[in-house]
């Protein structure tokens, strides 16, 4: 193993990055600064140097990645951070050793998902200046997994776990291995000016390349994101509360997802107080869509499950701009079940209620504004849709259809027909 390269610097030698960083730690002492020196070769794993820097300067200090490439050849678990500033000026490049990652990826703690890096702690500032980059070498993964959904042990790129008062800003994520970012057991944190591009160079959809997933988290703000991918742009999953998504542009993916949820038999989960505003959609499938598992447990996560309890409520989306949406902007499906099985779309005990969608305009490929495939056991309640101006791309007609199944209480629209009941997780057939 190459020797660990770690350089201790005085604060006065550092050019202060673009966000407001302090030369003093929370305790009033001057910050210790660690600059990670790259090994300079893909054969040299830079993880030992990174972990050493975060150990030395991870409490009241600053860790600097210079404008170089750092080779990430092994997993990282750095959850002890406290009042630390991480300054990424270069690129973190993950290796393409699929066998290693499948055998060593770390558990996320939800849906049997795995990850390459778990990062957590208190008062973390992670600054990328708009060019600091995570490169997951995703093309190798997209070819390897093919059409297999949730390939076992395929890692998320970054998991923010147990963080409080964190700020992640100006980071670029390209070619993520799977989900770009999972945010779990985290609170009072801000993720701003994040760029994600997970397109598959060989064509087709790079599935499971979500921009971000919130899980068991509260008071999370995601602003000024740009996501180009083949799956959920951003997803709020189990026990996500007080989440704000604003001033974002989403391209090519499925749109903002609530779920999937209701996957664990008998478990009570919620998504509450989600605020979505000022979003631009470029050729996504939907604007906002809901996906819950059926009332029957078939198999186990990540590709099986069902029978979960709970509700999604107090969800508001406003000021949405679309360019050639592929499907209805607002959909609900309660049909998710084991991969390859046909689910019962009407027996979920997970309820969806108190939704407000206002001020959506642009173009769409669908004549449907909404497709709500709700459970008969726990019908959807109190849905408002107002100020819709969606022109069907290529002509002058407008989307005016509202398809409903088991919906009680509508404001601003009337249901115009029955929803197509099918096993699609995205509310269509």
Curated annotation (Swiss-Prot):
Main EC class the enzyme belongs to: hydrolase
Keyword Hydrolase: yes
Catalytic activity: Hydrolysis of terminal non-reducing alpha-L-rhamnose residues in alpha-L-rhamnosides
CC annotations in GO: extracellular region
Cellular compartments annotated: Secreted
Hydrolase is among the record's keywords: yes
GO-annotated biological processes: cell wall organization; polysaccharide catabolic process
Residues spanning the signal sequence: 1-20
Induction cue: By rhamnose and sugar beet pectin.
Keywords annotated in UniProt: Carbohydrate metabolism, Cell wall biogenesis/degradation, Disulfide bond, Glycoprotein, Glycosidase, Hydrolase, Polysaccharide degradation, Repeat, Secreted, Signal
Top-level taxon: Eukaryota
Active site location: 231
PbH1 repeat spans: 217-238, 240-260, 271-292
Glycosylation sites: 67, 77, 97, 103, 112, 135, 219, 239, 247, 278, 344, 387, 395, 414
GO terms, molecular function: alpha-L-rhamnosidase activity; polygalacturonase activity
Family, as annotated: Belongs to the glycosyl hydrolase 28 family.
Function as written in the Swiss-Prot or TrEMBL entry: Alpha-L-rhamnosidase which is able to degrade p-nitrophenyl-alpha-L-rhamnopyranoside (pnp_Rha). The natural substrate of this enzyme has not been identified yet.
Record's protein name: Alpha-L-rhamnosidase rgxB
Encoding gene per record: rgxB
């Amino acid at each position: 193993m190459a020797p660990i390269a770690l350089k201790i610097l005085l604060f006065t030698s550092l050019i202060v990055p673009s966000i407001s960083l302090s030369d003093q730690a929370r305790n009033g002492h001057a910050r210790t600064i660690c600059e990670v020196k790259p090994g300079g070769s893909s054969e040299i794993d830079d993880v030992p140097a990174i972990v050493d820097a975060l150990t030395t300067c991870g409490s009241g200090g600053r860790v600097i990645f210079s404008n170089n490439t750092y080779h990430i050849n092994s997993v990282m678990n750095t959850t002890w951070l406290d009042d630390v500033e991480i300054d990424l000026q270069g690129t973190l490049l993950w290796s393409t050793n699929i066998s290693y990652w499948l055998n060593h990826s770390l558990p996320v703690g939800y849906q049997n998902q795995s990850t390459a890096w778990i990062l957590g702690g208190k008062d973390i500032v992670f600054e990328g200046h708009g060019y600091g980059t995570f490169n997951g070498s995703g093309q190798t993964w997209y070819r390897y997994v093919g059409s297999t959904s949730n390939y076992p042990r395929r890692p998320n790129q970054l998991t923010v776990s147990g963080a409080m008062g964190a700020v992640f800003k100006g980071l670029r994520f390209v070619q993520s291995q799977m989900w770009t970012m999972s945010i779990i057991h985290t609170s009072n944190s801000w993720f701003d000016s994040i760029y994600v591009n997970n397109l598959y160079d060989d064509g087709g959809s790079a599935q499971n390349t979500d921009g971000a997933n919130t899980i068991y988290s509260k008071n999370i703000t995601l602003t000024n994101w740009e996501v180009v991918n083949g799956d959920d742009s951003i997803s709020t999953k189990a026990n996500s509360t007080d989440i704000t998504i604003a001033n974002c542009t989403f391209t090519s993916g499925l749109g903002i997802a609530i779920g999937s949820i209701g996957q664990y038999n008998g478990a009570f989960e919620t998504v509450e107080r989600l605020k979505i505003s000022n979003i631009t959609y470029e050729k996504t499938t939907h604007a906002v869509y809901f996906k819950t598992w059926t009332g029957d447990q078939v198999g186990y996560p990540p590709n099986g499950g069902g029978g979960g309890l709970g509700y999604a409520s107090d969800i508001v989306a406003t000021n949405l701009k679309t360019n050639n949406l592929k499907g209805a902007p607002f959909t609900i499906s309660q049909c998710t079940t084991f991969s390859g099985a046909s689910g019962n779309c009407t027996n979920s005990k997970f309820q969806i209620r108190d939704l407000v969608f206002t001020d959506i305009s642009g173009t769409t490929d669908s004549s449907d504004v909404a497709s709500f495939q709700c459970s008969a056991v726990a019908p959807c309640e109190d849905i408002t849709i107002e100020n819709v101006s969606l022109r069907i791309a290529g002509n002058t007609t407008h989307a005016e259809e509202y398809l409903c199944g088991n919906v009680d209480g509508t404001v601003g629209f009337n249901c115009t027909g029955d929803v197509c009941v099918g096993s699609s997780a995205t509310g269509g057939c």
